[in-house]
Amino acid sequence: MPFITSVYAREVLDSRGNPTVEVEIVTDSGAFGRTLVPSGASTGEHEAVELRDGDKSRYLGKGVLKAVENVNDIIGPAILGDSVLDQVALDRKLIALDGTKNKGKLGANAILGVSIAAAKAAADLLNLELYQYLGGFNAKQLPVPMMNIINGGAHSDAPIDFQEFMIFPVGAPSFKEAIRWGAEIFHALKAILKKKGLSTAVGDEGGFAPNLASNEDTIDNILEAIKNAGYKAGEEVFIGFDVAASEFFDKAKGKYVFKKSTKEEFTSAELVEYYAGLVQKYPIISIEDGMDENDWDGWKLLTDKLGSKIQLVGDDLFVTNTEYLARGIKTNTANSILVKVNQIGTLTETFDAIEMAKRAGYTAVISHRSGETEDTTIADIAVAANTGQIKTGSASRTDRVAKYNQLMRIEDQLGEDAVYLGKDSFYNLKK
């Protein structure tokens, strides 16, 4: 039977050694679901609230015992006897229990853990894989991996202002081959950095964090790696960035400042022209968070300039929230949304954002967080929702590779039904 008989949360660790919430749900038939909740480093100010204890004597104030307590003492008792097969009703109940717009009372980390664990228990009950339960028989598109091979910005100590430099193996014939291409380019880049006497230590998301001179220097090294690995940049493999511009926007000056490298300052219009120059010079297919999350005028300038040429992904801008996404659609701002389950806090709201994006011709990119775990839920969500793109780090660190391995399992299970669309996944770009 599908009725919840047990809900239990505990405090565990994420990939950065910080506490996070793990939730387990059991039904009366013994069906079981467990999930671990991720955590971000660069967070949008409009995100749902990740509840931390603030007790400096434990984990530097980052403990999550309060969120765990909220699951065990408030949420759990409230949903005992409820069906795991009615995800929408369950998520609505969780939202109502919290009663705040940003889930600040119980914590999005508490609510999300319960939401996903319930879905996993439902899948277990029906003897289905999670992607099959969430997406039905039409869940068959494998996503293009946006592999983050160099980390800068808030994700590393390297003197590079852009937060992530990614490769997109769009020319691969399958997901499995796309991962092979990405891994080979990753190793080619490692060899280049080693030869130049640069660090091959990796950042939070598994990409290298070398002491390169600038954003352009970083791009040049990546293009060299693509070539050395035997692939053609601009045909088989493209590049992209998560700029995370909110991290270097100086509110006092009202300007964007490359604080970590050249110290250059830009107005919104000047930064748009800077990006346009990069797009003209390099095989770029995607830019994420090119403007500050509150700089809607700057975002509009960026979209008008480059929106028909490349993917412009809103992460901090939209925070997986249909309210902000609706504003973007109405004003024709950006053309893609980054989807992070813990930015909004329930599976239902996550799928609502994905569907709204698709209806408007925006792509939806399923994403990890910098503080990850061995949990592979986002891999299943990417296939369940046929999003066509996933951003889950580099070809190193088990917390990142776990998602790629799960996607390769799914592709194997799907067999000849599996679809990898490559560049056609970017349906937001005008042909």
Swiss-Prot record:
CDD domains: enolase (cd03313). GO terms for molecular function: magnesium ion binding; phosphopyruvate hydratase activity. It comes from the Bacteria. It is found in: Cytoplasm; Secreted; Cell surface. The active site is at residues 205, 340. Its EC number is 4.2.1.11. One of its GO terms (biological process) is glycolytic process. GO terms for cellular component: cell surface; extracellular region; phosphopyruvate hydratase complex. It is an enzyme of class 4 (lyase). InterPro entries: Enolase, Enolase-like_C_sf, Enolase-like_N, Enolase_C, Enolase_CS, Enolase_N. Its main location: cytoplasm. (2R)-2-phosphoglycerate binds at residues 163, 340, 369-370, 391. Pathway: Carbohydrate degradation; glycolysis; pyruvate from D-glyceraldehyde 3-phosphate: step 4/5. Catalyzes the reversible conversion of 2-phosphoglycerate (2-PG) into phosphoenolpyruvate (PEP). It is essential for the degradation of carbohydrates via glycolysis. This is Enolase. The lineage of its organism: Bacteria, Bacillati, Mycoplasmatota, Mollicutes, Acholeplasmatales.
